[in-house]
Amino acid sequence: QSIFLFLLITLSASAQQKITLEEIWGGAFRTQGMDELQSMKNTNQYTVLNFDRASRSMQIDLYDFATLKKVNTLIDTKNFPNLPMIDSYTFNKSEDLILLACNSKPIFRRSFTADYYLYDTKNKQLTQVLDYQIQEPTFSPDGKKLAFAKDNNLFIYTISSQSVEQITNDGVKNRIINGITDWVYEEEFAFVKAFDWNASSDKIAFIRFDESEVPEFTMDVYNQGLYPVQQTFKYPKAGEKNAVV
């Protein structure tokens, strides 16, 4: 009987606890996590992408593994009014340049295009890579260049001169893809980037997909306005031809 009374009192007390709108919208029940955690090379430190709700700004903060305390803030978007919210980031080999991805637009499950910015942690300078969206920009091992894909072709961006060199020319939507996987490889093998630099930063190896003979599939996309937009892409069903690699 005493156990029953104890449970009754406990349940009654818990039932009287109220949840307020201030708690709901103020984040009292928001789960805590770490976004874009990256371990730094040859140090006992790591970086995390944080969001400050009070200032509506984002920071890439440096932490110590041993103490879990913040050591430094590498970049804060509130110091750069023209810098959008950061979706992800990548360091070069020497970890003095940070490649920032912003305004990401999804293509399929893993692929996306984005606006990219380079931040020099030594001189605190921010530079927009290009004034259009690109895919999978990748630092060369010497940190002087970026290889990237756009419109099914591959390009090289030289950081010092901000110049672009096109290295493939036959890329065509729903026909030839250079350096980026087709839908099948992305979906079944879970990767998008199909190119990489050699160790001396003077050559790029890449996979070329010829999907000319792959049947097309068209679907309606309903999230872009009052009326749906049709998206047509190469989609090999069972028994149909796959892309030639």
Q: In which residue ranges do the predicted regions lie?
A:
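Sec-dependent N-terminal signal peptides
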Residues: 1-11
